[in-house]
Regions:
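Structural detector for short beta-strands of small beta-barrel domains
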Residues: 1-10
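Short aromatic-glycine-enriched beta-strand elements
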Residues: 11-16
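Short solvent-exposed strand/turn elements
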Residues: 19-25, 81-84
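Beta-strand/loop nucleic-acid-binding surfaces
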Residues: 23-35
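Short, Lys/Arg- and Gly-enriched loop/turn segments at beta-strand edges
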Residues: 46-57
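Short peripheral tails and domain-boundary helices/loops at the edges of structured domains
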Residues: 56-84
Length: 84
């Protein structure tokens, strides 16, 4: 599935994505950062847990942990940018 990165919290290594259905989710970037807003990514983002995604432009692979999907942007923003 193709998704677009909409927001990134680099401090917490979390990224919000928008899927082809207009729903949002977020994942933790494991090991390396490098994804930016408006990057198109490809992967199985509708499964919770560990996945490998690919940056469609660069072909670079990223290990991620999908925390949630199927939510509104507002809820995703609250989760990704909340203070601990």
């Amino acid at each position: 599935m193709r998704c677009i990165i909409r927001k990134v919290n680099y401090r917490r290594s979390l990224a919000i994505f928008e899927d082809v259905f207009g729903d949002y989710g977020y994942f933790e970037m494991l090991g390396k950062d490098g994804l930016e807003e408006d990057d198109v990514i490809v992967g199985n983002l509708h499964n919770l847990g560990g996945e490998v995604i690919v940056n469609d432009r660069t072909g670079e692979k990223y290990d991620v942990f999908i925390e949630a999907f199927g939510m509104s942007l507002k809820i995703a923003m609250e989760q990704v940018f909340k203070e601990k």
